[in-house]
Amino acid sequence: MITEERILKVLRAPHISEKATMAAEKANTIVFKVAKDATKKEIKAAVEKLFEVEVKSVNTLVLKGKTKRQGMREGRRSDVKKAYVTLKEGQDLDFVGGAE
């Protein structure tokens, strides 16, 4: 059983991009930035509990941080884990919640 504290720490933020928007429109898939140590089961449980929707599948990937330079200094951005969460048919998740 996953604790409620852990559920709140798994999802960091929704990932908004052109590719994520197209996936949401075509395949009913939502993209989240998640904790690097989060498992697929934890991500599924967190989405189902927080947004009250049914999850069909979860695919994850780790996006490696880019190397950036500022003058002679060189640094590296942090790695980010993303989760593509596919919702079951008839399920909908709306972050904006505009007027209808």
Curated annotation (Swiss-Prot):
Q: Which Pfam families does this UniProt record tie to the protein?
A: Ribosomal_L23 (PF00276)
Question: Any S-S bridges, and between which cysteines?
Answer: none
PROSITE patterns reported in the protein's UniProt record: RIBOSOMAL_L23
Query: Could you cite one Gene Ontology molecular function of this protein?
Result: structural constituent of ribosome
**An example of a Gene Ontology BP annotation on this entry?**
translation
Sorted alphabetically, the keyword list is: Ribonucleoprotein, Ribosomal protein, RNA-binding, rRNA-binding
Q: Which NCBIfam families match?
A: PRK05738.1-1 (NF004358), PRK05738.1-3 (NF004359), PRK05738.1-5 (NF004360), PRK05738.2-4 (NF004363)
Q: What does this protein do?
A: One of the early assembly proteins it binds 23S rRNA. One of the proteins that surrounds the polypeptide exit tunnel on the outside of the ribosome. Forms the main docking site for trigger factor binding to the ribosome.
Its assembly, as annotated, is: Part of the 50S ribosomal subunit. Contacts protein L29, and trigger factor when it is bound to the ribosome.
Q: What is this protein called?
A: Large ribosomal subunit protein uL23
Q: Which organism is it from?
A: Vibrio atlanticus (strain LGP32)
Q: Top-down, what is the taxonomic lineage of the species of origin?
A: Bacteria, Pseudomonadati, Pseudomonadota, Gammaproteobacteria, Vibrionales
Which gene does this sequence derive from?
rplW
